[in-house]
């Protein structure tokens, strides 16, 4: 008979999943206590976010957590190990990722001015370049973001390695092989943890790559997850929590622990 699965790794999105800007505390105390308990029993925890490392550090400091992650994934792809008060980069992965991104972005660079021009002509939106992507978007609203996404994806339909990574009205172009899902798989590889020992929790489009059965045994969406994520999680027999954000993650953790 197969061995009983054990919860070895918890992977949570940050904004809208672990953390809420609209509650005090931003991460429920009960969830912090539960994370401390499972970590004390040997389970590891990774925060997997679209935030930059600097923005995540700010959010963690402001939340004043009593428990800390073992790893973080930032800008949906860069991996850092948290040790003491330092974030230690996983250089092999991060450098390989940066090289792949740079090559892809150089390949499409001459096509981007037309995209910027089209967005600025048709929408009130912020489009800009930063060190992680040559095309970043803050749309005025979600319907505008929908239209911009359709245009960009059609424009680059001949570039299968290019992905439009979106969270609400925020988006960036990225390399399709470096996602929250592939970064989670790399963390699991480093820790020698099979997908059968992993729980993932997320609420938005950019979380779907890590909410795959090939990534995790237990897949959780809080009650505030967007309809597309909730529908997907339901379709794979994952757990739709009754509560929003961190309380929903806590409910998902209890669901997984009761399954063991």
Residues of each region from the PLM?
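Asp-based phosphoryl-transfer active-site loop
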Residues: 3-24, 211
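Structural motif
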Residues: 9, 71, 197-199
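Short, surface-exposed amphipathic charged segments that create phosphate/polyanion-binding patches used
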Residues: 83-92, 179-180, 255-260
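Mg2+-dependent phosphoryl-transfer enzymes with acidic/Ser/Thr/Gly-rich catalytic loops
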Residues: 5, 173-174, 181-260
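Anion (oxyanion) recognition and catalysis
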Residues: 39-40, 157, 234
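Active-site phosphate-binding/coordination module
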Residues: 27-120, 124
């Amino acid at each position: 008979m197969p061995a009983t699965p054990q919860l070895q790794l918890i992977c949570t999105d940050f904004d809208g999943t672990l953390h809420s800007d609209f509650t005090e505390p931003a991460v429920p105390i009960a969830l912090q206590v539960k994370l401390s308990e499972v970590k004390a029993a040997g389970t590891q925890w990774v925060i997997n976010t679209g935030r930059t490392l600097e923005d995540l550090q700010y959010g963690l400091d402001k939340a004043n957590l009593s428990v800390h992650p073992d790893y973080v994934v930032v800008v949906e792809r860069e991996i850092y190990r948290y040790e003491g008060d330092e974030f230690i980069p996983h250089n092999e992965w991060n450098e390989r990722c940066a090289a792949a991104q740079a090559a892809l972005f150089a390949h499409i660079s001459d096509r981007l001015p037309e995209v910027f021009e089209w967005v600025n002509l048709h929408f009130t939106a912020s489009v800009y370049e930063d060190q992680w992507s040559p095309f970043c978007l803050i749309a005025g609203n979600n319907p505008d973001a929908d239209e911009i996404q359709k245009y960009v994806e059609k424009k680059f339909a001949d570039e299968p390695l290019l992905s439009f990574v979106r969270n609400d009205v925020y988006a960036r172009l990225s390399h399709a092989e470096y996602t929250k899902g592939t970064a989670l798989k790399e963390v699991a590889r480093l820790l020698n943890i099979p997908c059968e020992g992993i729980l993932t929790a997320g609420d938005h489009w950019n979380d779907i790559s890590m909410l795959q059965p090939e990534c995790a045994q237990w897949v959780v969406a809080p009650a505030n997850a967007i309809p597309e994520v909730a529908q997907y999680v339901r379709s794979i027999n994952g757990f739709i929590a009754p509560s929003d954000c961190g309380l929903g993650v806590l409910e998902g953790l209890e669901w997984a622990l009761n399954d063991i």
